[in-house]
Every structure is written in C-alpha cells, then in structure tokens.
C-alpha cells in the first residue's frame, strides 16, 4: 500500500530572497565571529538567529519580538530549506531574542562587525569606494522626553521646536547610497562633534583615506 504523502503549505513571500542576500553578505558568519556565545548556548547559532530575525523584520515590517516565534513556527520548512540549518521555534522565544540583544549591545564589537561587513561587501560586489557622503538629519516624534533618553528638544530642522527629536548621522557610499556608518544620538546634540567619529569609523572599515 502506498504511503500517503505529507503536504506542507507555508507562505514563502520574500523570505528566500532576503536570506540569500544576507548569506551573500556573510551576515551569519560575521555575527558569530564578532559576538561569540558561551558554552551553554544550544540550538541555532546567534548568527543564524540574528539573520532569520532580520528577515522577519524586513518581510513583515515589524520589529516587535512577540511576533517572531509564531512567525517562525509557520515557516519552519521554508527557513530550514533556505538556510540549510535545523530551525526550531524554541530558537526564537522572547528569552532567546533578549539574550541576542544583550550580546549585540556592545559598541566596540559593533565597530569591528561593521568593518568586516563593509570590507566583505565592497570586495564581493566589486564596489568602487571613491567618494563617501556624510550628513546628519533629525526625526521628530510625539514622544515623552526623559533624562538620558534619545528624544530630546533641540534645534529643529523640521521647524517644530515644540516636538522632541532624535538625531541621525550617516555616511553613505556615493553614488550607490550604501550606508557605511550610522550613529543615532539624542536630539539636543550638535552636528559638528558627530562628524569626526563617523569619518574615522568609515576610514577604518574601508581601509582608505581621502574619500570624504
């Protein structure tokens, strides 16, 4: 008697495209290299958890942790086939994602990670780093101002000094517009002191001077 086949139905959407692009960028390996875990870590590596989590954010347009585990549970075959990994829903519980965030919140390691990512991207895609554009902007919001928080009152480029804002400094590779460095700081900060740290990080990551 012939066995009855098992039919699995999942929404694929843009997940394979996103994950393939992230693998070409070397994200899983870069995450694992620059944000190592201890011996008690089991299951999917931090690099793959982070990469699949990013694909969820981009595909769903939602950064909230609470939706990640059920999203993964409905796409186990798609995620496992695309990544070649043994993916389970327990790799994406709130506790596991909080553990990932704690390890990723390390400024010095982020600098090394960004440097490795930019060098890999420029090399693999044969980009020509001839000119880098550095500039800042601000984003206003109906947010509550708190001591030490990101949203603060400052000089408003949007002509809304009554609203708190957050400030973003970014360096991008011209003319492609690929981000090379991004700093998010509180809204009362002046622009001038933000340029030099951003420029120095770009120079370190691409290994060249005279681009700015």
Which residues are covered by each model-predicted region?
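Hydrophobic "anchor" residues on beta-strands that sit immediately upstream
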Residues: 131, 211-212
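Dynamic "connector" segments at or just before major functional cores
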Residues: 1-152, 162, 169-188, 195-196
């Amino acid at each position: 008697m012939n066995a009855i086949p098992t039919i699995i139905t999942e929404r694929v959407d843009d997940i394979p495209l996103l994950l393939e692009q992230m693998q070409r960028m070397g994200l899983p390996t870069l995450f694992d290299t620059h944000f190592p875990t201890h011996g008690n870590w089991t299951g999917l590596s931090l690099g793959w958890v982070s990469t699949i989590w990013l694909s969820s954010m981009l595909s769903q347009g939602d950064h909230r942790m609470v939706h990640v585990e059920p999203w993964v549970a409905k796409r186990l075959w798609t995620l496992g086939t695309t990544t070649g990994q043994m993916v389970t829903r327990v790799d994406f519980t709130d506790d596991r994602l909080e553990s990932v965030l704690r390890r990723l919140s390390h400024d010095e390691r982020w600098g090394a990670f960004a440097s490795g990512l930019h060098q890999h991207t420029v090399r693999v895609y044969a980009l020509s780093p001839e000119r880098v554009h550095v500039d800042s902007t601000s984003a206003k919001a109906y947010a509550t101002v708190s001591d030490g928080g990101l949203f603060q009152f400052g000089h408003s480029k949007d002509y809304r000094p009554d609203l708190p804002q957050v400030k973003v400094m970014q360096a991008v590779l011209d003319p492609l517009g690929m981000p090379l460095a991004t700093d998010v700081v509180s809204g009362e900060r002046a622009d001038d002191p933000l340029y030099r740290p951003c420029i120095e990080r770009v120079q370190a990551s691409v290994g060249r001077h005279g681009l700015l």
